[in-house]
Amino acid sequence: PQVYNWIHDSIHEVIHVDYKDLADGVSFQQAADEFLDWCGEEWIFCTWGNQDVMELQRNMKYYGMLSKIKGPVTYYDAQKIYGICYNEDPCRRSLEYAIDKMHLPKAQEFHRALTDAKYTGEIFKRLDMPAVLANPSIDVYQNPKTRKEEIYLSYPNYDEYVSREFA
């Protein structure tokens, strides 16, 4: 931990991690480098929700590492796609709700990064792949810089345009 020297009680209740757990871990820089090495050259993130990609980039910017991820970042939001596939869109369901609805075993606690990633993967691999491929998400923490980099996506029910930054 380098920014905050404590974890608020309400956060601790959700994520079940305390300050000592973080102090005993590797640095963010090392973890991010190892993660990106593991991802390889051609990657696309899959998340449960729309905040993880932005938070990763915010932390990478803080540590001077943002250039390692070219934005805008395209990713698959399994929470959004779950809602589409199960006719619950635009409702955003919890990871545990989706696990229960899909009758998947709950062997570990929720709100732990590795466990939640495994649960998200189990849900993701059961989603309708044409629906997945038709519904990528774009994180615009890093906006396009030029007209050539602008993004236009056409979804089944709407279109999305991500324009470049203007001075």
Where on the chain are the PLM-derived regions?
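Conserved non-catalytic scaffold segment of RNase H-like nuclease domains
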Residues: 1-61, 100
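Active-site-proximal helix-loop-helix substrate-binding element of RNase H-like nuclease domains
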Residues: 6-15, 19-22, 81-117
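Cysteine endopeptidase catalytic domains of the caspase/legumain-like
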Residues: 41-43, 105-111, 160-163
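Acidic active-site catalytic centers that drive phospho-/nucleotidyl reactions
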Residues: 52, 77, 116
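A structural signal for well-ordered alpha-helical segments within the folded catalytic domains
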Residues: 54, 118-121
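Active-site catalytic microenvironments for nucleophilic, acid-base chemistry
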Residues: 59-63, 84, 101, 126-130
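Histidine/lysine/aspartate-rich catalytic loop segments that bind and position anionic ligands
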Residues: 65-85
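Acidic two-metal-ion nuclease catalytic site recognized across multiple nuclease folds
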Residues: 122-167
